[in-house]
Amino acid sequence: MLLAQINRDSQGMTEFPGGGMEAQHVTLCLTEAVTVADGDNLENMEGVSLQAVTLADGSTAYIQHNSKDAKLIDGQVIQLEDGSAAYVQHVPIPKSTGDSLRLEDGQAVQLEDGTTAFIHHTSKDSYDQSALQAVQLEDGTTAYIHHAVQVPQSDTILAIQADGTVAGLHTGDATIDPDTISALEQYAAKVSIDGSESVAGTGMIGENEQEKKMQIVLQGHATRVTAKSQQSGEKAFRCEYDGCGKLYTTAHHLKVHERSHTGDRPYQCEHAGCGKAFATGYGLKSHVRTHTGEKPYRCSEDNCTKSFKTSGDLQKHIRTHTGERPFKCPFEGCGRSFTTSNIRKVHVRTHTGERPYYCTEPGCGRAFASATNYKNHVRIHTGEKPYVCTVPGCDKRFTEYSSLYKHHVVHTHSKPYNCNHCGKTYKQISTLAMHKRTAHNDTEPIEEEQEAFFEPPPGQGEDVLKGSQITYVTGVEGDDVVSTQVATVTQSGLSQQVTLISQDGTQHVNISQADMQAIGNTITMVTQDGTPITVPAHDAVISSAGTHSVAMVTAEGTEGEQVAIVAQDLAAFHTASSEMGHQQHSHHLVTTETRPLTLVATSNGTQIAVQLGEQPSLEEAIRIASRIQQGETPGLDD
């Protein structure tokens, strides 16, 4: 059936009978709104009766009929223009002695099915002309039927209340058509705008217009509020779950949010063996792309080839080019800002101390501020390494996506990290951080991308050096604490091998014996916050096969955790400490050889570079270091 609308002309009366009554629920019109074409006022209808016309859908419409005109006969079937049949029923309305019939604008009329419709008088020009259907009645009268939207009787109730509260409503299982919701909201907004005076009991916008609300209550659904403020984008849809109270701008967003309380995930992945379910269709669509590999959202920035599964991921990535950080920390005196709201949320926990993710492994007891760090930590216990390098012949596996992404750069010449000060690009985020500290005095931490696109060029990769091998195996980062321990060292068939190893073995770096001889054995570890941790040369000297444990020393001289250096038949790698002089310069530990030379790494061990300026790759840095030590002068980009 069609949505009723309450309208009036400038002369129309706006008071409903019983104006002082309590706020009431009014079932929305079950009849079609009929406007008489001649526009006669409904007052002083001497000798006039209402003619009930039963439409084909079973609803009843009342039309004005002069009793002197006998063209309409009780029980007569009228063929309407759309081909449907209407049945005429004559309903005489008795008059009080000496009084004329007064049907006031806005008056409630009780229909035969027990529902209530409102009499209204208005010009048809006030309606959307595309929604009006002209019906020629047999008495020559033209009536206009206003088609708004089909509203099922059992599903929809319009509750209009001045106090903005709803009580005594029964929930139902019916699903409401979004078009119905939209029509109801538009209707309430129209009444809010058109109404200038009204009785408080009806909840129409009246004298205290700014203080009143109009609520649209759908059975089985949360309260929806429509008022003038709604048009300006105010968050008017409130979550009614205990302790929540979050506000949303649309009913749809509220409904999606409520699934976080109910656990409802109606959208299930149909990919064989998957079975994951999601709260939104968009979430499912994005997930399916992990199976298909589709990444339709491509960055348009020059020299950037990244693509993403969702437009949201692309938007986050674009901020790495623009430097935009729209999400500011709310704590006074902090001043940090972030590219995503989720990163800000995790950051805020550094102020509050909240760590809601607890490891359930017996005897562990660790807790984390972010779900990502928690999941990565759990994989230490399970041994799971779900992220596999897809470059042919590599097959390295990683516990976290970011480690896989960082690993990818060893196979290509991609430099995904750019300096927002000067525009220089780098393969490793740690090298970018070091550049910003040394060149621009910028100590602001850099957010690492959790999702990024990488597509290695076909057949392209770094050449693997022959000969002895140094393997640096990365550690696992869990929040701000890094666990660096000795793992297993295996013989790879090479005659000489050095392994600097920590708990989560992943990244391998190949190096020739000539390069090892040129490099020496001084290593500086640089933590994520820029603090240099030096492994002293006299402790790091390897003179024979065996394992040597040395303590990492902070810049202030405080001893830290133990790092193991394992050597096998490395007499050629030995350099006596007496033959090397060292001096501390800025963040670099340099030798007194021809050129300054330092190996550096982040505290979680995911990147190593030679500090010869700004080297992006460990293998490239080692090659350049070797050539410099041998008297050559290669450029940084060689």
Curated annotation (Swiss-Prot):
The modification N-acetylmethionine is found at M1. It is found in: Nucleus. Keywords: Acetylation, Activator, DNA-binding, Isopeptide bond, Metal-binding, Nucleus, Phosphoprotein, Repeat, Transcription, Transcription regulation, Ubl conjugation, Zinc, Zinc-finger. The modification Phosphothreonine is found at T352. Expressed in all tissues tested, with the strongest expression in ovary. A zinc finger (C2H2-type) spans 237-261, 267-291, 297-321, 327-351, 357-381, 387-411, 417-440. The keyword DNA-binding applies. One of its GO terms (molecular function) is DNA-binding transcription activator activity, RNA polymerase II-specific. GO terms for cellular component: nucleoplasm. It holds the Pfam family zf-C2H2. GO terms for biological process: positive regulation of snRNA transcription by RNA polymerase II; positive regulation of transcription by RNA polymerase II; positive regulation of transcription by RNA polymerase III; regulation of DNA-templated transcription; regulation of transcription by RNA polymerase II; regulation of transcription by RNA polymerase III. The keyword Nucleus applies. SMART domains: ZnF_C2H2. Signal peptide: none annotated. Gene3D superfamilies: Classic Zinc Finger. Belongs to the GLI C2H2-type zinc-finger protein family. Transcriptional activator. Activates the gene for selenocysteine tRNA (tRNAsec). Binds to the SPH motif of small nuclear RNA (snRNA) gene promoters. Participates in efficient U6 RNA polymerase III transcription via its interaction with CHD8. In complex with HCFC1 and ZNF143, regulates the expression of several genes, including AP2S1, ESCO2, OPHN1, RBL1, UBXN8 and ZNF32. This is Zinc finger protein 143. It comes from Homo sapiens (Human). The gene is ZNF143.
